[in-house]
C-alpha cells in the first residue's frame, strides 16, 4: 500500500512538471522506516521504478563498477546480470557518501528488475549525463524486464 501511495504521489508531481528530489536522510526519514531503504542509492532506484522512469543515473566519484583483474582493476562497461559475487566485490563506503559501491549495485538490481535503464558514472565528468545515456562512459545496467 505504501509503495502504491508513493507511486501515485510521484505521478501527480511529474504530471505537474515537478521533478522531486528525495533524500532519505532528510525529507522522508521517519523512525518507522529505519532500514527500509538503506540509503539514497537504493531509495533512488525504488523511486525510479515507482515513477516508471526511463533512466536512473547514479553520479559518484568513480568512473563506474570495477572488478579485480590482477594488478589493474577493469571497468565493466555493461552488466547484464548482477551476481552475488559482484556484490561481494563491493565493500566500504565512498568518500562522498555513506552507501559505497555495494548500495549502487543493489540499486542497479532494483532498477533493472523494475524495467529502468541504470548507469553508475563519475559525476565530475563534464558530460556525465549525456555521455552516460549514450553509453560512452560509466557502467550501464540494462533493464532485465519490460514494463507493462
Regions found by a protein language model. Name each.
Residues 1-148:
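C-terminal catalytic "cap/lid" subdomain
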